[in-house]
């Protein structure tokens, strides 16, 4: 069994053979991973893109748990420019061979089909959420945000996201198994500041031993139009030695 996995996409190619495409995710001729539809109308568009090989995230025989790091660049672009945003992008870990649940469009990001916090979901996600509004998304804070989601669309931890429409965002997500610490950092090259959120997450208690990793995004039922494009993606994971 492979206890270590690393891959790196500087760019993508159409019909990339080591990416599983679900819903309306695709790769453009220019090498961009487009997680949702890029042409109007995109109402209720939903997509996911997963690395084809499963990741060994913990081992029941030894009790070992993986530490991982992933970095990626993405662009979320809205039209018209002053729109509210609909709805956002996630990086997530879910059971291997996971599919898009029915009823999971818009602010449920193709991950959940309700706001229920069910342990059977077996999902950890980092959401980059451009839409907030108590009418449709009562679980959200009152600002655009980065959130850590555990089995539920209601984040266990959020931080305000200074979203820049159409700008490239650089993200680094690290998970340290010994401390059960998940840290997310997002920055824009045009700016020296970062939006950072850290949460305590026990992978072994939430996820199955083998998971799929990737991106998901959803567009709501609105006049606004939003695209969710991933430009590059690096991931590495390693099962740690036995805990003392």
UniProtKB/Swiss-Prot annotation:
Binding locations of Ca(2+): 129, 131, 137, 142
CDD domains cross-referenced by the UniProt entry: lectin_legume_LecRK_Arcelin_ConA
PROSITE patterns registered for this protein in UniProt: LECTIN_LEGUME_ALPHA, LECTIN_LEGUME_BETA
Domain of life: Eukaryota
Residues involved in Mn(2+) binding: 127, 129, 142, 145
Gene3D superfamilies found in the cross-reference section: 2.60.120.200
UniProt entry tagged with the keyword Metal-binding: yes
InterPro entries, alphabetized: ConA-like_dom_sf (IPR013320), L-lectin (IPR016363), Lectin_LegA_CS (IPR000985), Lectin_legB_Mn/Ca_BS (IPR019825), Legume_lectin_dom (IPR001220), Leguminous_Lectin (IPR050258)
Glycosylated residue positions: 113, 117
UniProt GO molecular function: carbohydrate binding; metal ion binding
Keywords annotated in UniProt: Calcium, Glycoprotein, Lectin, Manganese, Metal-binding
Family stated for the protein in its record: Belongs to the leguminous lectin family.
Notes concerning its domains: The peptide 129-Asp--Trp-139 is responsible for the carbohydrate binding.
Quaternary structure and interacting proteins, as annotated: Homotetramer.
Role summary: Di-N-acetylchitobiose-binding anti-H(O) lectin.
Protein's UniProt name: Anti-H(O) lectin 1
Organism of provenance: Cytisophyllum sessilifolium
